[in-house]
Amino acid sequence: MSSLPSSRRTAGDTWAITESVGATALGVAAARAVETAATNPLIRDEFAKVLVSSAGTAWARLADADLAWLDGDQLGRRVHRVACDYQAVRTHFFDEYFGAAVDAGVRQVVILAAGLDARAYRLNWPAGTVVYEIDQPSVLEYKAGILQSHGAVPTARRHAVAVDLRDDWPAALIAAGFDGTQPTAWLAEGLLPYLPGDAADRLFDMVTALSAPGSQVAVEAFTMNTKGNTQRWNRMRERLGLDIDVQALTYHEPDRSDAAQWLATHGWQVHSVSNREEMARLGRAIPQDLVDETVRTTLLRGRLVTPAQPA
C-alpha cells in the first residue's frame, strides 16, 4: 500500500477498537467517563466507562475519575484534567446542537466516524428520530456488542453503517435507509485530523450534496498542538502501556481547507466559537500556564441556506 502524505497511515488501513484510530475513540470515551463521575458534570455519558473498561485493564484505569495512573506527576495530572474538561465541553456543545436541531424539526441524524459515541442511547430523541452511525465495521460491532450485553436500548432508531469514510459511504448510507429528501443533522466530531485534506473536502462535498433544505451540520475543526497532544499521549503509553501515537495517525498538511470558510462558501450559514472561549463560558477555562499544552479547536454549527444543486 502506498503511504499517504504527512502521516504514517496507509491507504485503506483498517483498525479494531484498541488499534490505530480506534484506540483514540477509547481515549475520548475515557474522558467522558471521567467527566460523568464528577460532582457537577457538564455531560452525562453513563455508557462511556463500560465501553472503555471492556477493552482491557489499562483502558479501565484511564477511565477512572481519580486519575490515579498519574500519581506523582502533577503537571501530567493537570494537563490531562484540562483535556478531559475539553472533551466534556465539546460533547456539551454538540449535545446542544442536536437538541436545537430536533427542536427545529429535524428527525434524521448522521454521525460521521461515530466511534464510541453513545448519543443514540443517551439523548432523549423525539419519536421518529433516526440516527445513522458511520464507522469501521469492527468499531461499530464492538460498541453494539458491549451495550447490548449491558442491556442498553437505543432511544432512537439506530442504524449502523459499516463503511470507511474514504470509500463510497453515501451509497452505504442510502442503502441503510437515509432519505435525502428530509433535513439532516450531520456531525463530524473528532474526525477531520484523521482524514487527508482532499478527503475532508470530499466529505463536505458529499454532505452538502446529500443535504435537503433545513439541514444542519456541526464540525470540530482542529489546529493541532503537536507538543501538547504528543506529550499527553506519551504519558498514556509510558504509564499504562497503551500503544497510541496520535501524531502518527493524523494529517498535518499546511494547505488544508478551513472548514468554516469551506462551508460558508458552499451554501452554509456558519457560527463558530473557539474551544478556549467555549471552555471559559462553561466554567472550564484553561489555566494560563497550560495554554501551550492544550489542543486548539474551533467548534462550528451550520445551517444550509442554499440547497445543493443535483449532480
Curated annotation (Swiss-Prot):
Keywords: Methyltransferase, S-adenosyl-L-methionine, Transferase
UniProt key word Transferase: yes
Listed name of the protein: Putative S-adenosyl-L-methionine-dependent methyltransferase MRA_0152
MF terms in GO: methyltransferase activity
Source organism phylogeny: Bacteria, Bacillati, Actinomycetota, Actinomycetes, Mycobacteriales
Residues binding S-adenosyl-L-methionine, per UniProt: D135, D164, L165
Species whose genome carries this gene: Mycobacterium tuberculosis (strain ATCC 25177 / H37Ra)
Domain of life: Bacteria
General function of this protein: Exhibits S-adenosyl-L-methionine-dependent methyltransferase activity.
EC code(s) of this entry: 2.1.1.-
Biological processes per GO annotation: methylation
UniProt-listed Pfam families: LCM
Protein family: Belongs to the UPF0677 family.
